């Protein structure tokens, strides 16, 4: 199978490496210098340092060539760009006049200014593209790059997209499950990043494992309430793309969002943290969108509100925790 991966960040690179073990895979990035480095060293030293990529993996900075590679009905196009760059990439795809038959995206979050989920952005920019879906689940790019076991879910209304994605990814140490709850999968992937900042703050303040468990559990309730209000199914949030991804991101040391919380608890400013991180922390980007949607649907999301207070309103991390503890008692 021919597979084009658009976006050579950590996640796009790791997935391309996995795909190249079985398929004719082309990894695209608009940065010609990055592509030249990949071609010379078969390593993404900028985003996935120290992990050798398969010799069979090919690289290109020409979007037209990448789209042509993944356009056919028996091929697949994987969008690896983050949510912040998704609309720009989709418009470039539209302008190229080469819309792939099957598209799957792996970004997580809400578009910051519109509060739209990725599938809504894709519907707006590529309305003629109907065989598409989201691939998500508890996964760190570095572990996938190392070939360690991982389980993901592809969700799509299109049976053809589910089958094509399954055929591409389900091999080696990667197990793929299928479903059709695109909204639920996307909401889980977005909200868990905000909640991971909360658990990072709690851990950074030394509040203990009891507090971590409480935040994860009550955070899952927040995720589910918002997801159902937006059209997702409640059972999705107890699966890989809800609870599974939340546990990993809230507790794993490779989690950028958890790192943001830990550093905030230590007293560092958000600007300093993001500058040193060098990678996207989607929880910071989409926290305000999550809270705005909660308010629009009259949904209580106190943990999310506390995180936004720390990130954007100057609330001290310890004061944010105290505010959560002062909330009135209620039935679970």
Swiss-Prot record:
Alphabetically, the GO molecular function entries are:
glycerol-3-phosphate dehydrogenase [NAD(P)+] activity; NAD binding
**Where do the annotations place sn-glycerol 3-phosphate binding?**
108, 137, 139, 192, 245, 255-257
Q: What reaction gets catalysed by this protein?
A: sn-glycerol 3-phosphate + NAD(+) = dihydroxyacetone phosphate + NADH + H(+); sn-glycerol 3-phosphate + NADP(+) = dihydroxyacetone phosphate + NADPH + H(+)
- Name a Pfam family for this protein: NAD_Gly3P_dh_C
Q: Where in or outside the cell is it found?
A: Cytoplasm
PROSITE patterns in alphabetical order: NAD_G3PDH
Keyword Lipid metabolism among UniProt keywords: yes
Which EC number(s) does UniProt give?
1.1.1.94
| Gene3D superfamilies for this protein | N-(1-d-carboxylethyl)-l-norvaline Dehydrogenase, domain 2 (1.10.1040.10), NAD(P)-binding Rossmann-like Domain (3.40.50.720)
Catalytic site: 192 (proton acceptor)
Protein family per UniProt: Belongs to the NAD-dependent glycerol-3-phosphate dehydrogenase family.
Which PANTHER family has this protein been placed in?
GLYCEROL-3-PHOSPHATE DEHYDROGENASE, GLYCEROL-3-PHOSPHATE DEHYDROGENASE [NAD(+)] 2, CHLOROPLASTIC
Function noted in UniProt: Catalyzes the reduction of the glycolytic intermediate dihydroxyacetone phosphate (DHAP) to sn-glycerol 3-phosphate (G3P), the key precursor for phospholipid synthesis.
Could you tell me what this protein is called? Glycerol-3-phosphate dehydrogenase [NAD(P)+]
The organism encoding this protein is Burkholderia vietnamiensis (strain G4 / LMG 22486)
